[in-house]
Each structure stands twice: as structure tokens, then as C-alpha cells.
Amino acid sequence: MKQYKSVLLFALVVVLITACGPKATETPVFQGNNPYAPQTGDSNLMIGDLTIDSSSVFLAKSQPPQVMVNFAYFQPTPCYQLRVEVSGPDTDKHINLKAYAVAEKDKPCALMALATPLQASLNLGSFPSGHYFVMLNGNQIGEFDS
């Protein structure tokens, strides 16, 4: 009987200690669809800058609402491929997108830059309740309430 009381007392102490601990916070993780995610061999490629022509952020009418980002961009030449790194939200509720282009280092490209911008669309997924800011290459392109 004494052993039973000891086990019960120990279990009660453990429950009380865990109940008094910090509340678990919901940490959003990117769970959207990024067809432009960095690839494993990108470290061997040459990186080029993009010029963003236009951008938009909107919520898709779904349950839960999905955050969508569209942007038009110019890349150095058609030989480059788009990459977009998605991070956040950070403590200030900024969702950061870093867009750039990659191309093979030792392969010359004789093609001229395109005169019309290319289009890209990303589904960032859904987020916990709050007010968020979407940043693309350091510039705010939109905000939304979730």
C-alpha cells in the first residue's frame, strides 16, 4: 500500500509540474505548394537577380483559407530557372520570400532577356489567427488576416 501511495504521489507531482509549464505555441511551418523550391544541385549553379514587375497576395476561398502569391518577373536570360525560398512567419509575422534565378555556370547562353515578364504562383498554405505581412526580396507585397 505504501508503494502505491508513492507512485500516486509521484504521478500527481509530475502532472502539476507539467501543468504549470509554458503553454505550447502553434508554430506555423510552410506547408504550401512551392514548385520553385531550391533543388539539391543548386549550389553548383550560378545565381542571377530577378526584377519583380508586379505582385499580389490573396486568400483563396477554401476551408481553411489558403494564402496565394502571384508575381511577374524578369530574369537575366531564358537560360535561368526560378527559385523561391519561403521562410517565416517570424516573430513580427513576416512571411519572407526570396526569389532568384539559377543557371549552369560553364554553359554560355546566347539568348537575350525576354521583353515580357514571366509569371509565378505559390500557395503558401494556411496560418493560425493573426495579421501577417508577405515580403518578397525584402519588399512588402501584401498583408492578410487569417
Explain the meaning of each model-derived region.
Residues 1-8:
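Bacterial N-terminal signal peptides that target proteins for export
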Residues 16-19:
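C-terminal motif of bacterial Sec signal peptides marking the signal peptidase cleavage site
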Residues 21-23:
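Bacterial signal peptide processing site
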Residues 26-65, 81-83:
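Beta-strand/beta-sandwich contexts
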Residues 61-106:
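Mature extracytoplasmic domains of secretory-pathway proteins
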Residues 98-126:
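An anionic, turn-rich surface loop/hairpin at beta-sheet edges
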Residues 103-108, 138-144:
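Short acidic/polar inter-strand loop motif in beta-rich domains
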Residues 130-136:
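A short tyrosine-centered beta-strand micro-motif
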